[in-house]
UniProtKB/Swiss-Prot annotation:
InterPro entries membership: Ribosomal_uS8, Ribosomal_uS8_CS, Ribosomal_uS8_sf
Transmembrane stretches, start-end: none
UniProt similarity note: Belongs to the universal ribosomal protein uS8 family.
Keyword Transferase carried by entry: no
Species of origin: Saccharopolyspora erythraea (strain ATCC 11635 / DSM 40517 / JCM 4748 / NBRC 13426 / NCIMB 8594 / NRRL 2338)
Protein name (database record): Small ribosomal subunit protein uS8
Highest rank taxon of the organism: Bacteria
Biological process per Gene Ontology, one example term: translation
Amino acid sequence: MTMTDPIADMLTRLRNGNSAYHDEVVMPHSKLKANIAEILKREGYVSGYRTEQGEKGQNLVVELKYGPNRERSIAGLRRVSKPGLRVYAKSTNLPKVLGGLGIAIISTSGGLLTDRQAIKQGVGGEVLAYAW
């Protein structure tokens, strides 16, 4: 069965694994998912990620991050632009997530960027997801 929205599937797996206090979450690999995982790692939401060979191709393994008393580092993840309703934003009106406490993941002509990076570079694009 084909997957309609692989990004939403990734975010749901991360959200569910985070809620269940899993140490790792495994999902099918793609370059876009690896780039999203890289942004989440760089911003401090996950501790790392790696690619492993699975039975049906490559898998992306994301290592979730928790505080000293098992506090979750990801409070929320939300898909914004969906296959049925694409959401685009100019660099002048990119969204602020929780007043700047969270991040928006933007797909631009220069690759995936956070909202702060896109504003700094003066580029807009498709708003893929929010993380806080």
